[in-house]
Amino acid sequence: MKRFLTFDELKSLTYEKIEALQNQKFRAFIRYQIYPNHPFYRRLFKEHEVDPFDLKTPADWAKYGLPLVKKADYKGNLREFVLNPQQVDGQDRNPAEVIRNLLDYYKEAGYKDERSFVFRRGLKVKLRVGKEKATQELLDHIKYQYSPRFFWFSSGRASGLPSPVFLTHYDNELMLNNMAKSGKMAIDPFVKDGFELRAMNLFPSAPHLGFFGVDGGLLQMADFVVRSTAGGAISTDKLVQLAELFKVTGFAAMPGYLRNIFCQELVKQKPKLEKRGIILLAGERIYDAVVDNIKDYFAEVGMTETRVIGGWAASETKIGVACQCQEKGGYHNLSPLAFAIRFVKFTDSVGGYEFTSPEEGGYITIFHLDGRSSMFEGYLMGDHVDRVTTGKCPHCGLDMPCFFNISRESEIGAQMQVMGIAEEKIKGATVNLTVLRESLLALSDIHEAQIIVSKSKPDDPYSMDVLSLNIVLKSNTNQTKAQRTIQKLTKMETEITPEIHFMDLDTLLEQAGGLKFQEIVDARVKPS
């Protein structure tokens, strides 16, 4: 069994074979990684009286009555979502049991080389033949697999800090290999003509999957990488100059930044770019009109043959990514051995659900099949797709589901039902608006607060997002001091500098709907 499939291997397999590999990995992962080592799911299985050995495919999650896990569950139990083989039910685990679980996992998953490595060294320890060296090698192996080494952030939580998703060295290895495939998907049609990818990473340098994943993926598969980042130490005008200087043929960015900031500077300076180029977009919903705008801007400066491809991932997917195979097309899961994507619909208002048929679409739910540290099973992402097609893709030849029109549930009440929190993508950052408002109201000087998300150009649905706060202060409050405090808190929790509007309570109540107070408003005009 392979840990990940190369792009060519992925194209050579039928979906029946891919699904069989997924089910094998799912069984092994649930039985010998999740149940023994994951405190949250171990407790969940016990509470619902589910034997992990009964879970043979992701569909069994619904069959045995397990609830979907929501973002609110994770944000309230961060430590319990981290695999910990050294403890079980709060007690230290015998080291021999740790090794036995690992051997069983490798056997069930089909990892022959890894099982042989652990078995031989375990035998040396038992027979006291080269025991010291073998013990150290086992410790190094377990440390590489399980010890958290870094994190990136999901959205904010009640403590006022964003929620970290932890990764190990092992996770990083999987992530780098899987992320590179999205780039290879993008350049695949150009490869036969000798296309040389000289890429520029325009994602903001921050502890997020968007930067780490893109940066690592580009380093794996590009001929040259300009690791420049957007909105950082290098100004946009200098980034455009670097693109011309290094003959960049590939740009990776969030669509809002690329269209509204970088491309505006591009057409202003009019550098001479290469004729053929690749543009990778992620981090925000990708609208067809934005793709057309971006292509037109690049055509103005000589890049007349562009291929614009979108990617989908999230902090919690960690080690995997889905990607379009053609402009304005659907998305394929390019990491099917890392995580499985399934789609659900809700059957009642208290969490009842069922898996949907392909033509129905539904809410994206993920099941990790590999990885360490923070892990998620039956995890509701909050993103919705309109439809899913199956069979061999007529565009790229992949024989696997293709899902279309990814969108975030925008109605606040529906979000609370789906995810247990209200989140929005604002300037590419996932912002927990529910927690932000709670944090604002916890400030001693604030009496009431309303959050509004809008557009910098109200009539342009593709213009930059704006986060506005309508604030009512308590009497005798220093407004200047309060403004600094609010800006600092909001920047820390959301990475966004807000527009702050102070007003009296009567004015706010009138604007916010009177008795039916609208605490959070998404006023962004939607594309027609």
Language model regions located:
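Short glycine-enriched loops at secondary-structure junctions
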Residues: 172, 204-208, 256
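Conserved AMP-binding loop of ANL adenylate-forming enzymes
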Residues: 182-221
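Active-site glycine/GP-rich loop and adjacent strand/helix microenvironment
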Residues: 1-40, 198, 223-528
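Glycine- and other small-residue-rich loops at beta-strand/loop junctions that grip anionic moieties
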Residues: 97, 102-103, 203, 228-229, ...
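Catalytic micro-motifs at enzyme active sites that drive phosphoryl/nucleotidyl and oxygen chemistry
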Residues: 137-142, 204-205, 238-240, 265-268
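Nucleotide 5′-phosphate-binding alpha/beta core
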Residues: 1-154, 160-181, 245, 465-470, ...
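Conserved ATP-dependent adenylate/AMP-binding module captured primarily in the ANL superfamily
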Residues: 175-198, 235-247
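Short acidic, glycine/Ser/Thr-rich loop/turn "cap" segments at secondary-structure junctions
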Residues: 135-140, 160-169, 196-203, 226-227, ...
